[in-house]
Each structure stands twice: as structure tokens, then as C-alpha cells.
Amino acid sequence: MANPFLMDEDLDGCDAAANPFLMQSEPEPSSDNPFMAATVASNPFAFGADDLELGAEPEAEATHDNDLDPAMSFFGTTIEAEDDTLSLKSGAEEEDEGKKPPQSQPQLQSHAHPHPPPPRPLVPPQSTQDLISTVSSQLDETSSELLGRIPATRSPSPVSMRDLHSPSPTPDSGLADLLDVSVDSGSSAHTQGIEADLISGVAGGVRLDNPFAVPTAVPNIQAAVPLPATPIKQPPRPPPPRPAPPRPAPPGQAAPQRPPPPLAAVNPPPAAPEADDLLDMFGTTACKPAKPPPPKSKEDILSLFEQPHVPLSQPASKPDLLHDDLDETIGEGEPPEQEEPDTEQSNEISSRDEPVFTSLLIRPDESTHDITSQPQAATGLERQVNNMAAPSGTASTQRATTPDIEITTVEDLPRSDDEDEPEAMQEPETETKPQIEPDTEPEIVSEHSPPTERLVTQAALVDGELIAAEPEPEEMDTGLDFPLASSGQLSANPFASPDEEEPNFAPMPAAVANIFAVNDPDSQMETPKAPSHTANIFASDPDEFDAFSAKFDSVKKDNISIMDGFGGSGAITPTGGDAWGGSAFGSTTISANACGDTNSADDGFGNDDDDFYAMQAPARADSVESVDKDFSVVIRPMAEETSGVAPQLAPPPPPARGVNQAQTTSLPGLTVNPFEDVSGFPAPGLPPTDGTAIKRTDSQDTPQTPLYDEDVSQPLEEFPRLHYIGPGWEMQLRQPNKKKITGQRFWKKIVVRLVVQNDVPVVQLLNQAGDKQPFQELPLQPSYSVSEIGAQQYDQFGKIFTMKLQYIFYKERPGVRPGQVTKAERITNKLTKFAQYAIAGDYEGVKEFGSDLKKLGLPVEHAPQSSQLFKIGSMNYEDMKQFSVCIEEALFKIPALRERALTYKMEEVQVTAVDEITVEQDFEGKILKQIARVRLFFLAFLTGMPTIELGVNDMWRQGKEVVGRHDIIPVATEEWIRLEAVEFHSVVNQKEYERTRTIKFQPPDANYIELLRFRVRPPKNRELPLQLKATWCVSGNKVELRADILVPGFTSRKLGQIPCEDVSVRFPIPECWIYLFRVEKHFRYGSVKSAHRRTGKIKGIERILGAVDTLQESLIEVTSGQAKYEHHHRAIVWRCPRLPKEGQGAYTTHQLVCRMALTSYDQIPSELAPYAFVEFTMPATQVSHTTVRSVSVQDSDGDEPPEKYVRYLARHEYKVGIETTHGESTNAYLAATRPIREEPPTTATKPTASPVAPSDSDTDSN
């Protein structure tokens, strides 16, 4: 008859009254069916609403109370507002609700407690019965649906229908946790109400009708006497915002998955006895609190949700089987008088317990059936239910507080036990076992909940809970199934750390006498004796609890919530210790810490009762507590070995359950922790302290190679071409210098020298190398620069390399240069708005645009203007490179000063970082040498006389940068490099750099200067961005040059693919073969160009030709770019604008094949070109990983920070060996020209023999 959903009229009056689902406003004489009995359309779900608020609704409610037994309140869960939400209210119910003023929980509780078990409820009117049927069906359906909705991250633990319907604090807390809504009001209210009840009399006449209800704040049994800690009576919190419970579908729709059998129906008459027995199960058979009459009206129900009043000591009400007051459980063994003193506590506990367990999502039929069907279980559960019923008044009061909890939705109830049961509370076995094995669970739970609960619950549960355990599993009470007192928290969340969850109400724990320790009144008394709020409800052995508490006190300080699924602070905090982020029961008053805090003793989770609680709650992945904490608190009150906090392991350690199992061996199921699933809830493990942790590489965005070579044992090798020692270079000067008529210009052979006169480098042009006086001298200035090396037609045979020495100056002019976007973007945006204004006819908008345009002005670019000083040319490429480097070295050393303050319309700063690397490889690809340096160029257009501070990623500056937000240059990576052999331009304050490693300088105006340069050591094992393999193959009269280029493509994971640009590969060709590549044109000789062939593909006319005859092999074929003979290089040059090509991925290969068919008269040099030369650039400082991190402009006269642009470039030069192979057939020329090895050695070794006359030979060549 524990099933409040049972609608039989056979239920005892008391039991019937216990059915909280009875919503009828009119008491029904035939109150056999607790659901039918609704005298005043009282909400059958309001537990003891009548009892609680008999005064308020003496008439209707009294009748209803009589009609509804505490057992009648469904699982001790007075569902008023929430029940209404869950179930379609009957018109009568609504009327009653409207008619009857909502009674305060306290009132309801007080009424509930004082009233003896209410007489059987009258048979509820047909409307009530229909309503009950609908509600039960809806609840069942809703629970299943909600369970299905539970996020995968939460182990889907079926929520008992009881929990769904129970407004008990447990659901409240759970809801808050699930919803992440602070249940302070609700939890507090529940807790307070429970607190009051518990404190007022733990053994108060009112037992927790709902054994499953976990008092949100279950006072410690020890604190049976009202504890001052309870003082924190928080007004009942309004129900936390909970998703509107799915409206119960019409009875037809909601196929009653489990038709709620009337509680009385299951075992109507025995309801009270069974309740007693159940209470006896907990060891408190001696005295049973009178069950508060079920709330008769919605007001009652609502009042149930209101903050519970500290119930006056009430006569033991008929224990609600479903509710099975924890109080009764605890105090039943105690004499009723005990209950009276503890009435407040017991009431409070009862209410707490009731609400908590009531809110359990126990499926009414299953849990009820289980409880009712099994006499023992029914007895224990009944006692609990009756207690819950009595507390149902209390619970009702608490329920009033409980409004936070939305009974309707499983989601609302974030119960750990609910979670424990992956599905409907049908798995009560585990939970029931927890009740029986609370000890075991408490261990596991104890991590989360105080051991006290475990002790009392264990005793009580072992007696009755084994029996009730089976029914309870259905309940899946989050903490409701667990002794409310145990956690001392109505909605203590097994996962919630009591401290974190909510302010623990120390007094409450006292009241939290172990509800389940009915058999252990003394224990309860002991707990009360321990005024500490952490008094263990179950702590028959205070010493154990103390050790336990001490063990977890330290843990709790850190964050019990991490693993404290049950020790959630009584309050429901969004981030509660609850597995869902809040204490499962949301018992604010009960601060029983899972670690055994004063309030933890009040662990209201009924850890022992619910294997879910017994189980260690896995840390939520998203829980800050779980993630941040290095350990999980595992409370094992019964375990002697648990002398300290158990380290948080990946999954909650099964051993904890094992301990509880040992304690509650009778419930093997309890040992199974549904949350133990490591895959589901891996608890954060301790960070590796043995150095095995993954070490961060120097660069998170680059391949797993160091940014630089750590080996500095060898001195840096000098960068090539820096120091030139020689007479000068033979070059040609383009004359006249200024272009007039092309036909009049010519090349004049000269000699160029670079000398220093008065500390100023001077370029001298001489007619002859022996001349003493140059015919022209050109002192270099900082604004001079050399151009890139080019080539132009020299004569009919080929081209000449050219280079200009030029003077560069800049002008501000309207326009937008590539890369300049800021002002242009602003104007573009304005234009867009202008178009909108114009279309809309918004004259004001058009005027505004004109005003803005006038303010902004046209985009301005600083366009470089170059004036050519002279152009020189040479047929030798290396000479041109050397001359260019020498000029740049001279310019770098020229002092540059900012002579005057200028004014710019737009201030701009440009920084260019250039990597230069030279690599030598043998034909096998082995790197013989790589030398790299970095150069930073700076160009500024700034108003006034500002000072610049440039920040680069120098490892010495890591962590010491202090710059304004406008000065920061966005960077894609955090990389810090080592600078070696740093050289500065004269403008840099070198003393400041030596002191602080900061680069400060006053930039010259509009001068593109090389600000600094430094060396880096590229790592030896770094993969080159472009790899060439070239081979000469000589076979007979055929020579084949084959080259393969591999482009890894990805040099940076974060920056993405960085291509190689302007790739040129030179394969020197012997002069004797040059004619093969020459083609006569009108006025000059041209070169044979390559055919672009994709491997294995033939297109164009070649398709037709291929069908008739084999394709003629082209002299040069390439798969990418173009290759041709370039006479000025005396080489076949393969050029590709970009590798890999657009759209290609990493590790692409590109091929060149040059087939030369030689005649027998063609010479074959004894040695073909040993090296190929590769040059290319990359748009990033791929070699050094240099980054410009900030550009700070100080003492600027500008109104706004200057626009800043940073460009990165890497220049690569490779010298790669070419392998030479010979085919089987011997080349005729080579064979003919092979040196004849006469036999001097052979003849010398021959033994001298007497000459034989050739007389016997017919043919004598002599």
C-alpha cells in the first residue's frame, strides 16, 4: 500500500490520506483509495497538508487529512503546485485550491505532526480518481520521457515516480542542481522547514512519511534537539525555475506505464503497521510519529512547498509506507516522547526526509508495489512512508519550500540516485540497497555525504531497507530515498559537496538525526548529543563519524563537491556538489558535508539507502570543481582504512563501494555504482608528478622540432658574401644614365669599387682597373638602396644581369596601396551606408556621409618615388650578388638622423622581417651546412619627433613586455627565440638594449632602414621546405637530366600552409650542349622552352599523333612551372611562381625531365655540373620564427595611433649536389676519348720471356 498511485479504495484511511496525489477538495467517505480521498480537493500530493495546516483548513483539510493518510501522501511527497503541474488538476482540485488559502508549510507540518495517523481517506470522487489515474500515467510517462531527455553526460538514472511527484526538498535540490538554479530559497525553505521539524523534534510525533524523502536539511540525529545551527532558516525558496513539467497527457495518452496502485490497496490496513514495521526496520518501532493528514487542498500542497514551519511535536502520525519517515525510522525505536522533544527535528527531518525522498523519482507503482508488496520492505518503507506521511505535513511544509523542485520533470530532479538508476526508478534495487547498504554507499557516498547518515541509515536500512530496498530502487530517489537525516540536506546531492552546495545550516544537522536509524535511537540521540551539525545521523558510533568528519574536513575545505555527490551543501547551487552541479537534495539547511562536516553528519542523501549515493559520484567533466580538484573526496565512515581523503582517481574507486558493501552485505546491488562507469564520468586524475606530463614544445604551431639549435658549442659561421676582399668588379654601366631615346643608350665596360672616405662609403666608377681616379664617385646616403637583380636583353645572344642604385623618397598622395586597409575600409563602409541613405531618401544621412568623408579625407598612401642614380650590369651573377650585399652592408652602417619634425595626414609604421638562409646539400640530401640570419627593416611616417620601442619575440623579453593595447601586433603563435650576434643600426639606443633588451630608437623620417640584424641557428633536423633531388644519367648517346622537387608544404600547423614562391632552380649546362637549346628568331636567338606535361596524360593533337606514332619526346618536360635554357645563367632554369600550386596539399612532388640526344660528335665533359642552385622566398619568417610583437610610439604628436604593418619574408638559397650515373651502354665519345691506359704497369709486371718468332703465324702485321 506504499504505492500512493494505487487508487484502490481499500487503503486505510491513514494510508489513503497518505496519497499526496489525491487532489480532491471534498473528503470522500470512501477514502480507502488515498487518491480517491480528497476531502477538500486537497492535493493528494501535498503531504500532510491537512495535518500541516489543519488549522488553516480545519474543515476541508481536516476531512482531507483524515481522508488522506500520511502514507496517502504519495511517497510522502505532497505534490501541490508541482503535482498540479505534473497532473492535470481537476476542476474540483482547482476550486479547492482557489478556495483554500495556501497553508504555510510550517502550519501543514505542525498539523501533520500533531495529528495521529489520519483515518482512511474517503473514496475520492470520480473526478479525483480520474485525476489520479491521469496523474499517475502522466507521471510515469513523464518520468520515462524525462529520463530519455537527460543529457548523455549524466548517467541516465531513472527518477522514481515518487521523486517526480514529491516536492520534497530532495527533488528541490535535485531540480536546482539539474537546473543549475540556486535553491537557496527552496532548499533553505526545505531545509529550514525540515530543520525546524527536525530540530523541533527529530523524534517528533511526525516521522518522515516518505522514507524516500531525503530531508533537504536533515538535522543530525544527535541534534534531535533543535540546534541553533538550524537558525539559518531560509524562507522557502520559490521553486527554482524549472521547465514546465510536461502537462500530463490525457489519461489515454499517458498510458499508465505503472498504474499507481492505491497505497492502501497494496496493503491498506497494514499500511500503518507496515509503516511502523518499516520504521522498525530503522529500529524505531517503539514510537511512530502520527502521520500528518495529507494536504486536502492545493493550498495545503502549496503550503507544503512553502517553508516548513517547525512542526510542533505531533503525535506520531500513521507512518506513511511510502514516506516511511526517516524520523520514525530514526526515532521509531525511540519512544514517542523522544519524538516530541525531537519533534521539531523529527518533523523537520521527516519533512526533509519526506520531501527529499518524496521527490524521489520512484515510480509509484514499482516503488510502491515493491514497498507495499514486500511485507518487509513495505514495513520498512511503510514506516518510512508513514513517517514521510507524518512529515508529509512536515514534508508538505517542506514541500512548500520544495516548490523549487519540479516534481513533474525528471530533469528537474538532478538526483544522484536518480542518476544512479540509469532508468526509471525501477532499479530501486541499487537505491534500496543503498538504503540497506547505506553504510556501503555512505562510504562511496561518504565521499559526498557524512558518514552519520550511513550509520543510521545502515541500521535502519538493513532492518527495513533491505525490504524496502527493492521497492526503493524504483524510486531512484536522488537523496530522497536516503535518510534525510543522513545528509542533513533535503536535497543533498551525492555529488554535491555540502560546503559548496549551500551554506550548511549547522543547527539542521543536529536535527538531522538519522532518520533511518530508527533502530538506533541511541545513535540518533548520540548524534544529537553531538551538537555539531555534522552529527552523523547514522553515526551510532560517534567516533567513527568524528574520524570520518575529520578525514573529510580537510577535503571539504578544498572542494568536497568534486566527488561529493551526496554531500552537496544543503543548498542547491548551480555549481553544487551535486552530480548535476548542485546538491541533489538542495538542502540548504543541512550542511552535512559528505566529508563529515557538522552538517555532513546530517547527510540527507541516505547514502546507505541508495546505492547511487553509495557510489562515488564521478566528477562532472564540466564541473569546475571536478575539473579543478586534484582529488575526489571519498567518505567511508565505516571503513577503518579510510583514515584520510581518498585521492580522486579517474573513476570513483570501487573500493569505496566495497566497504559499504561489506557493511551492507545483504544488499549486493548496492555495491554496483552506476556512475562507476569510467567512460561516462572519468574523474579528473591527479596531475602526473613524476615528470611524465606532456611537455610543451617550444612552438605549438610548428613541427615537433626546436625553434633553434640548442647546441652553441661551435662558433657561428660567417654569413657568406659579407666581407669582400678584392680589386672590385668588372661591370658595365648603362649610359647615358637618363633614358632619352632607347637607340642611343648603350653599355659601357667599367670597374666598380666600394671604398670608405671619411667614414662614408663611396662607390667609385673607373674606366680601367688601373685608373687612379674614378670618373664618377657616389657617396652613399641612408636613403639610398639597391634594387633586386634583374636581367635585360644585352645582345642577340642573350641577356645581362642588371641592378640599380637608387634614391628613394615618399610622397603622401591619395590612393590605397596594397595592404593598406584601415581608412579605405572606413570609407567603404560609409559608402555602403551612403547608398542606403540615398535609396531611402534620407537627406540627413547623406549629409552625414559628406561630413564624415570630409573628416576622414581621401585614403592616403605613402608612395615610394625612386630616382635612379645609375644602372650597372654584369654577365656574372655572383658578382652582382656580391656587389649588392656590399652596398647593403655599407648602408646599414651609415648613421641616420631625424633632422626635423614633419607632419603627416596619416601616420604609418612598416616593419619587415626577413630571414636569409644558405644551405648546402650533397646529392643524397644530407645537409652539409646551413647558415641563417634575420634582418629587420623599418619605415616610419610619423608626426613630430617620436620614439619607437620595438618588441620582438626575444626569449629574454618573455614575460617582461609592457605595452599598450594599441601597440600590440596580433601574432598567431607564442614563440620565443634566441638572438645571437645582434647588430644594430646607429639609431638604436644600444645601451638601453644591453640593459633591458628593449629596442628603442628615434626613426629617421621616411627612410627605409635596416634596423637590426641577428643570427640564428636553424635546427639540424628540421625538414627543408623545398627538397630537390637531381640526377644526370648518361647512357650511350643519350643524356637525361631528371629533377624531383618535394614540397612538404606545411611548415607551421597554426599558420597553415606556407608556400614557396618565386622558385628558381638552375642546372648548369656544358657550353658544348648549348646549341641543343637555341632557336633562331628574327633578330636573336631564342631558347627552347619546356613542354608542360602531367604525368600519364596526353592532350591536344598529341592524342591523334599518339594513335599513329609514338609521341616525340620534348627536350624539356615539367609538371609545374616552366623550364628553359637561360643563356645569361648558362643553365636550364626551372621557374615556378608558387609551390605547391594553389589548391595542392602538402608533400606534393614536381618533376623536370630534360632528354638530350647527342651525336657521336658531341662532347661529353668529363664532369657534368656538380651542383644545382635553388632560390625561393616564403611569406613568413619560416627559418627563425621571428615575430614582431609590438610597436610602441612614444611622444607622438599624432591624434591617433599610427597604422602598423608587419611583413615577413624568408629568402632561401640552396646549393644541392647532382648525382651522376651512367647507363649500361657506353657513349661513343666517351669511349673514344677515354684515356688509353698503356700497359706500363702491365708490362712491368709481365715476366720477360724470350720473344717468339711469328713464323708460325700466317698474318704478321709487322
Curated annotation (Swiss-Prot):
Domain SHD intervals: 728-902
Compositional bias of kind Polar residues: 128-145, 384-401
Record keyword Repeat present: yes
InterPro entries per the UniProt record, alphabetical: Adaptor_comp_med_subunit, AP2_Mu_C_sf, MHD, SHD_dom, Stonin
Quaternary structure annotation from Swiss-Prot or TrEMBL: Interacts with the second C2 domain of Syt.
Other remarks in the entry: StnA, which is involved in the same pathway, is derived from the same bicistronic transcript that encodes these two different proteins.
Protein name: Protein stoned-B
Encoding gene, per UniProt annotation: stnB
